[in-house]
Amino acid sequence: MNYPHPIIAREGWPFIAIAAVVALLIHAVGGFGLAWPFWLLLVFVVQFFRDPPRAIPTQANAVLCPADGRIVAVETAHDPYADREALKISVFMNVFNVHSQRSPVDGAVQKVEYFPGAFLNAALDKASAENERNAVVIQTGAGHTVTAVQIAGLVARRILCYVRAGEPLSRGQRYGFIRFGSRVDVYLPKGSRARVSIGEKVSASSTILAELPEQP
């Protein structure tokens, strides 16, 4: 599959460069015995910013998982960004997960809203309403509305979003990044059927999160 992004995310290049320079300088001055923790840190930073290509399911009504991580919520909830009752599915990313976000569906971006907030543990339910977050509301060609919300966490304090209202999105398309541990909430139309359960490990784009109903 042709993936139009480097396998090490561009968002991490400055951090990797800094970690490499520090490790090299300390190694040059004090040898490996002194520098090994910094080499270990470099390895950690490189693995954190990995961004591998993924197989993308082609099932027509499938909603794909927007992020790597673990399912922490599957529930009926109010979607405050599209003002409706919805099926809410939440994915928590720890520091060892890939942290790019990918579109769960094909569609057009209806709006993008950023909200400043706190930096609570993203695994907590209240993080959805209280933490810094960025919501992307997407309308599919069939008329379904899907909301994906990037949420900052205890360590993650930098949400990056690369789409604007009116732009098209393809399922599996990379549209954002959150640095160092975070959460993504997905709100789906009532009648959608969840294909995941709480505690399940999921992968961005390759895991089917839910199935949309036949009619919007």
Swiss-Prot record:
MF (Gene Ontology): phosphatidylserine decarboxylase activity
Pyruvic acid (Ser): residues bearing it: S182
Cofactor note: Binds 1 pyruvoyl group covalently per subunit.
UniProt cofactor(s): pyruvate
EC number from the UniProt entry: 4.1.1.65
Membrane topology: Peripheral membrane protein
Record-annotated site: Cleavage (non-hydrolytic): G181, S182
Function text: Catalyzes the formation of phosphatidylethanolamine (PtdEtn) from phosphatidylserine (PtdSer).
UniProt record similarity statement: Belongs to the phosphatidylserine decarboxylase family. PSD-A subfamily.
Name of the protein: Phosphatidylserine decarboxylase proenzyme
Provenance organism: Burkholderia pseudomallei (strain K96243)
